[in-house]
C-alpha cells in the first residue's frame, strides 16, 4: 500500500499488523509519511527510535484495570442504587523525542 500510493502522507495503525507496516515503511524510507500506531512494544519503540514512526498512542492498561475494579467495587457497595459510571483514563503519547 505504501509503495502503490505515493500521495499517502499519513497512516494510522489502530489494530494488528503494526510490525508489517513498520517493515514496509523501513523498506520504502519515505520521509514525508507520518505513521502513528497504538501501544508501545519493542517493535514500536524501535520504530520511534529509528524515525520510522511519528508517534505511538499507548493505553495504560494497569491503570485502566485498576479504575475498572474500583468502579465495580463501588457498584457492588451501592447495590440497587448503583448508576452507570464513566471512567476516563488518559493515554500516553510517545514521540521520538520522549522515548
Enumerate the language-model features and the residues they cover:
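Short beta-strand elements at the ligand-binding edges of bilobed clamshell
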Residues: 50-62
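Hinge/cleft segment of the Venus flytrap/periplasmic-binding protein
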Residues: 63-99
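Hydrophobic alpha-helical
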Residues: 1-42
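Well-formed, non-transmembrane alpha-helical positions, independent of function
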Residues: 46-47
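Short, hinge-like loop/turn segments at secondary-structure boundaries
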Residues: 1, 29, 53-55, 74-75
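Short, acidic/turn-prone active-site loops that include or flank metal/cofactor-
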Residues: 38-42, 59-64
Amino acid at each position: 500500500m505504501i509503495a502503490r500510493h505515493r500521495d499517502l502522507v499519513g497512516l494510522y495503525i489502530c489494530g494488528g499488523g503494526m510490525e508489517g507496516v513498520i517493515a514496509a515503511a523501513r523498506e520504502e524510507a519515505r520521509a514525508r509519511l507520518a505513521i502513528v500506531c497504538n501501544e508501545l512494544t519493542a517493535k514500536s519503540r524501535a520504530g520511534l527510535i529509528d524515525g520510522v514512526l511519528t508517534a505511538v498512542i499507548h493505553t495504560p492498561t494497569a491503570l485502566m484495570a485498576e479504575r475498572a475494579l474500583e468502579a465495580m467495587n463501588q457498584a457492588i457497595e451501592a447495590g440497587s442504587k448503583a448508576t452507570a459510571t464513566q471512567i476516563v483514563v488518559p493515554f500516553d503519547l510517545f514521540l521520538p523525542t520522549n522515548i
